[in-house]
Amino acid sequence: MIRIGHGFDVHKFGGEGPVIIGGVAVPYEQGLIAHSDGDVALHALSDALLGAIAAGDIGRHFPDTDDKWKGADSRELLKDVYRRVKEQGYKLGNADVTIIAQAPKMAPYIDAMREAIAHDLETDIRNINVKATTTERLGFTGRKEGIATEAVVLLIKQ
């Protein structure tokens, strides 16, 4: 049996950089405002994994109303989510992550993001795709107000 999950996350720019995205520090003059480290890519990916096993979303498991998660490392949250996936008898087939941002430029960091995600999800890098796009200066991402990310995962019964 296979299961598919979809995740989405958005964070607004603010404060000092860098931007943490895909588990990688990307130099930028601003960071992202969030309760945790604000890693929109890993948040969307975590939501996709939780959705695939019908386990809600990261807000349910790591609420921003709980100081325990303040400044949390999203890579650790992702690992915890993947532990839940494995407990349900599934493993990752593949993941596809789309970062939507006018800035900063993501291309130089994509390979490092793929490596970090593959490591955290205990899979081969060939099972992880990360790509970035702009909105051609349209909308809040085009105005450089924040970053959005979508993620899709395929899980396979072990």
Curated annotation (Swiss-Prot):
One of its GO terms (biological process) is terpenoid biosynthetic process. One of its GO terms (molecular function) is metal ion binding. Its cofactor is a divalent metal cation. A divalent metal cation binds at residues 9, 11, 43. Gene3D superfamilies: 2-C-methyl-D-erythritol 2,4-cyclodiphosphate synthase. 4-CDP-2-C-methyl-D-erythritol 2-phosphate binds at residues 9-11, 35-36, 57-59, 62-66, 101-107, 133-136, 140, 143. InterPro entries: MECDP_synthase (IPR003526), MECDP_synthase_CS (IPR020555), MECDP_synthase_sf (IPR036571). Involved in the biosynthesis of isopentenyl diphosphate (IPP) and dimethylallyl diphosphate (DMAPP), two major building blocks of isoprenoid compounds. Catalyzes the conversion of 4-diphosphocytidyl-2-C-methyl-D-erythritol 2-phosphate (CDP-ME2P) to 2-C-methyl-D-erythritol 2,4-cyclodiphosphate (ME-CPP) with a corresponding release of cytidine 5-monophosphate (CMP). Belongs to the IspF family. Homotrimer. This is 2-C-methyl-D-erythritol 2,4-cyclodiphosphate synthase. The gene is ispF.
